[in-house]
Amino acid sequence: MKVGVVGDRETAIGFRLAGLTDVYEVKNDEEAVKAINELANNENIAFIIITERIAESIKDKLKNINKVIVEIPDKHGKLERIDPVKELIRKAIGVSMK
């Protein structure tokens, strides 16, 4: 089984240097969706690594993907996002989890 990667230029270069071959450098959401669909339809791909920023911008399209998707920070660092489980707990019982 292989790993697929979808990311910006720097992310793609890093994974290519690490020896991965199924690496897509994308510049916009349309290219990202096309690359992820190609990887998702490849039976040799076990999971797909994408940058958090790409995942955030196309999150609706990722719901239909049947592969494991791993989000990683890009060169700008980790995105500050609300943990959905913590938010559900806060709404349900009124207590913020840290």
Swiss-Prot record:
<dbReference type="InterPro" id="IPR036906">
    <property type="entry name" value="ATPase_V1_fsu_sf"/>
</dbReference>
<dbReference type="GO" id="GO:0005886">
    <property type="term" value="C:plasma membrane"/>
</dbReference>
<keyword id="KW-1003">Cell membrane</keyword>
<dbReference type="GO" id="GO:0046933">
    <property type="term" value="F:proton-transporting ATP synthase activity, rotational mechanism"/>
</dbReference>
<keyword id="KW-0813">Transport</keyword>
<dbReference type="GO" id="GO:0005524">
    <property type="term" value="F:ATP binding"/>
</dbReference>
<dbReference type="GO" id="GO:0016020">
    <property type="term" value="C:membrane"/>
</dbReference>
<comment type="subunit">
    <text>The A-type ATPase is composed of subunits A(3), B(3), C, D, E(1 or 2), F, H(2), I and K(x).</text>
</comment>
<comment type="similarity">
    <text>Belongs to the V-ATPase F subunit family.</text>
</comment>
<keyword id="KW-0375">Hydrogen ion transport</keyword>
<keyword id="KW-0406">Ion transport</keyword>
<dbReference type="GO" id="GO:0046961">
    <property type="term" value="F:proton-transporting ATPase activity, rotational mechanism"/>
</dbReference>
<keyword id="KW-0472">Membrane</keyword>
<keyword id="KW-0066">ATP synthesis</keyword>
<comment type="function">
    <text>Component of the A-type ATP synthase that produces ATP from ADP in the presence of a proton gradient across the membrane.</text>
</comment>
<dbReference type="GO" id="GO:0042777">
    <property type="term" value="P:proton motive force-driven plasma membrane ATP synthesis"/>
</dbReference>
<dbReference type="Pfam" id="PF01990">
    <property type="entry name" value="ATP-synt_F"/>
</dbReference>
<dbReference type="InterPro" id="IPR008218">
    <property type="entry name" value="ATPase_V1-cplx_f_g_su"/>
</dbReference>
<protein>
    <recommendedName>
        <fullName>A-type ATP synthase subunit F</fullName>
    </recommendedName>
</protein>
<dbReference type="InterPro" id="IPR022944">
    <property type="entry name" value="ATPase_V1-cplx_fsu_bac/arc"/>
</dbReference>
